[in-house]
């Protein structure tokens, strides 16, 4: 079979990997690491919980399906007429898993030997859906229990209450697993419909990192991959205003200390963000709130946060983007106020150059050291590819960042009128 090969080399790190466009439509990313004892493989599709409204290129109108189908489909794909895929992996000694996020569904394994056999299993079961009325109904009970369990999970609730207070219509505000009501509407026909739309190999990517023979990997792919049709699929979102829904939301649950999530809604989030944009925001967050920052020390000195729970993240994807700070605090309002004040000080006085340089070096070092892990490499390749980005471009962007890049992100995103505080309080 004819394949298009491309060697991609990082300007900063000097490492290389191969990108192969397979005739079946699948993009294959191969990152050899000869000294590695484990190989990690991950097969991902650009299909997550936010994809409940979509438009196929071969159909005239968009379609809407019940929430929770992507997650449901991931659960069901492990089952086939021949049994469970986990049982098949256990025979090769591979450790397998799968996950559904807001934007992607991924199936993965790691192994120390029997790689090609394990790869066959992965490519086989993901391309062989098997849904019946009986198995679909059985799964509804299992996932229904999972949904109810998350309803009382404080970390889950503080996050989704935050997203609901921030987003008016974007499906990021809905639980990944759906609701008990939405999954009751799922049928075998709907599962096949979504499978055939999103598990088209042209919408998917396979990445391997570790010690392997590239030719043998491609032989397995040639044998196992079923050619995709030329259908493309686009996400369809309702218009999302730049304004938030409400600035404060709280809920009582069984916690000892109040938990909080505080952050800012990025405007015009439907516009694409480059590798450089993402790197700039990550460096800004590190400069503002890392354990080396004045803000962190002040919050610790005032006993407003604890080191083990405080964290921050740039959470962004198709049609959404937000900067989030979370943790436990006796006074979440005081934490939010301190973050706002420090962002305002940065805007007024400028971001300290030394702190910016230190943060950039720290993050760059973390990213480069992650290239020693086959899991980090393969996950990074897939995650970047499914977002329309490239791993080495991101690393090179991090190294090339300027203070101006970071200041632009500060001015654009850290605005009080677009901030939300979500709190989970102890039950009275």
Regions found by a protein language model. Name each.
Residues 1-84, 192-298, 420-428:
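His/Glu-rich zincin catalytic helix
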Residues 2-9, 205-208, 346, 359-428:
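C-terminal regions of mature proteins
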Residues 59, 74-76, 106-110, 130, ...:
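Second-shell loop/turn segments in exported
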Residues 81-194, 306, 338-341, 351-379:
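Acidic/histidine-enriched segments that form metal/cofactor-coordinating
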Residues 98-101, 174-175, 196-202, 253-256, ...:
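Short, flexible turn/loop "capping" segments at secondary-structure junctions
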Residues 232-238, 307, 311, 349-359:
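Flexible, glycine/charged-enriched surface loops at secondary-structure junctions
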Residues 261-268, 287-329:
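A structural supersecondary motif
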Residues 323-352:
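Extended amphipathic alpha-helical segments enriched in small hydrophobics
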